[in-house]
Regions:
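N-terminal signal-anchor transmembrane alpha-helix
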Residues: 1-42
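Residue-level signature of transmembrane alpha-helical entry/exit and packing/kink sites
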Residues: 10, 14, 18, 42, ...
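Alpha-helical membrane-associated segments of multi-pass integral membrane proteins
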Residues: 14, 99-138
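Transmembrane alpha-helical segments of multi-pass membrane proteins
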Residues: 16, 20-21, 71-89
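Alpha-helical membrane-inserting segments
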Residues: 24-36, 56-64, 85-93, 97, ...
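Interfacial non-cytosolic loop connecting adjacent transmembrane helices
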Residues: 33-45, 89-118
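Canonical alpha-helical transmembrane segments
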Residues: 50-72
């Protein structure tokens, strides 16, 4: 029972928080980019802003505010970098997998958002799990 309450349950709660904040951040970033982007740079601005906020939101689920500043910075940077890598993979895979007629651009958007959310959560999950199991730091 000690293993479940002190190690396993916090990991699942933080994974859920990371996914929740990641999707919410992606939505907020997309709206910010869509409202502020000029027409010629619409795709670049909306995707960059949604991926950046998605990575920050995903990492926010794993930040422990009692940690050192370097540990917090490592988690935030790894979340953003993971989100950019995941968004790139989601964009490439999304064009081929999601075929929706009459909705141009929605396949890329869906792949980018899903890839950024998953990619933004993987590095903080690894770092946070190591931190929980090695140091017992939640």
């Amino acid at each position: 029972m000690y293993l479940v309450t002190n190690y396993i349950l916090p990991i699942f709660i933080r994974i859920w928080l990371g996914l929740f904040f990641g999707f919410m951040g992606a939505g907020v970033g997309y709206l910010m980019g869509a409202l502020m982007a000029p027409t010629s740079l619409f795709f670049v601005v909306t995707m960059t802003s949604s991926v950046l906020t998605c990575g920050l939101g995903s990492a926010l689920g794993w930040v422990s505010f009692t940690s050192s500043k370097t540990s917090i910075a490592l988690i935030l940077i790894s979340g953003v970098l993971g989100a950019f890598i995941g968004a790139g993979l989601g964009w490439v895979i999304g064009k081929d997998v999601y075929i929706m007629g009459g909705m141009p651009g929605i396949a890329e958007l869906s792949g980018i958002i899903k890839g950024a959310t998953v990619g933004g959560n993987v590095p903080p999950i690894i770092i946070g799990s190591i931190r929980i199991f090695r140091r017992g730091e939640l």
